[in-house]
Amino acid sequence: MYLEQIKAELNEAATVLNKFINDENNMKLIQQAALLISDSFKQGGKVLSCGNGGSHCDAMHFAEELTGRYRENRPGYPAIAISDVSHLSCVSNDFGYEYVFSRYVEAVGQKGDVLFGLSTSGNSKNILNAIKAAKEKGMKVIAMTGKDGGQMAGIADVEIRVPHFGYADRIQEIHIKVIHILMMLIEFEMAKTE
């Protein structure tokens, strides 16, 4: 009944993943992002993560695995997903949704922290504002984008881009794979100092 559609979906996902893997620069950027986060943790910094929709869930997933665990039992790492409903609804109502993440960064972010922002289009105004606020605070920025990187192209310290121009779900599938690899590398790196 749907076997061909199922196979086509999986084949498309594999094609997007293989294209991402075959760009050696992506491997270097993932390593660079993991080291940037690990260095922040070693110096007392934290990660603030944010995204919209499915990317918001990925931001929460990343923070949860940093504070909780990924594969190994180890001390928790300082991370906050900007997901507090009272904060989001307050700022959305009083200032506008484009400021929900930047207001939090202004309040909680410190020099040496890392902003981890996800946007499949690279054009999410609230993520762009968060990046601006993070830069003003002296924070480092890791951006996970898709397509051509949108307005986020070139403005982060590290941008990991999935150059897929179809539906956003394919981009998000690579983003979560990258998040899991980042977790593995961060755990490897932090184990050197624990």
UniProtKB/Swiss-Prot annotation:
Task: Tell me which EC number(s) this protein carries.
Answer: 5.3.1.28
Q: Which cofactor does it need?
A: Zn(2+)
Q: Which CDD domains match?
A: SIS_GmhA
Check the record and name the InterPro entries matching this protein: GmhA/DiaA, Phosphoheptose_Isoase, SIS_dom, SIS_dom_sf, SIS_GmhA/DiaA_subfam
**Protein's cellular compartments:** Cytoplasm
One molecular function GO term is: carbohydrate derivative binding
| Pathway per the UniProt entry | Carbohydrate biosynthesis; D-glycero-D-manno-heptose 7-phosphate biosynthesis; D-glycero-alpha-D-manno-heptose 7-phosphate and D-glycero-beta-D-manno-heptose 7-phosphate from sedoheptulose 7-phosphate: step 1/1; Bacterial outer membrane biogenesis; LPS core biosynthesis
**Enzyme's top EC category:** isomerase
Q: Which domain of life is it from?
A: Bacteria
Identify the residues that bind Zn(2+).
Answer: 61, 65, 172, 180
Its main localization is cytoplasm
Cofactor annotation comment: Binds 1 zinc ion per subunit.
UniProt keyword Zinc, yes or no: yes
According to UniProt, the reaction catalysed is: 2 D-sedoheptulose 7-phosphate = D-glycero-alpha-D-manno-heptose 7-phosphate + D-glycero-beta-D-manno-heptose 7-phosphate
What GO cellular-component annotations does this UniProt entry give? cytoplasm
Instruction: Please give the Pfam families that the UniProt record associates with this protein.
Output: SIS_2
Q: Which GO terms describe its biological process?
A: D-glycero-D-manno-heptose 7-phosphate biosynthetic process; lipopolysaccharide core region biosynthetic process
* Matches recorded under HAMAP family: GmhA (MF_00067)
Other observations noted: The reaction produces a racemic mixture of D-glycero-alpha-D-manno-heptose 7-phosphate and D-glycero-beta-D-manno-heptose 7-phosphate.
Subunit structure of this chain's protein: Homotetramer.
Role: Catalyzes the isomerization of sedoheptulose 7-phosphate in D-glycero-D-manno-heptose 7-phosphate.
Q: Output the PANTHER family linked to this UniProt entry.
A: PHOSPHOHEPTOSE ISOMERASE, SEDOHEPTULOSE 7-PHOSPHATE ISOMERASE / DNAA INITIATOR-ASSOCIATING FACTOR FOR REPLICATION INITIATION
NCBIfam families, alphabetically? gmhA, PRK00414.1
Family the UniProt entry places it in: Belongs to the SIS family. GmhA subfamily.
Q: Give the protein name, as stated in the record.
A: Phosphoheptose isomerase
Q: Which gene encodes it?
A: gmhA
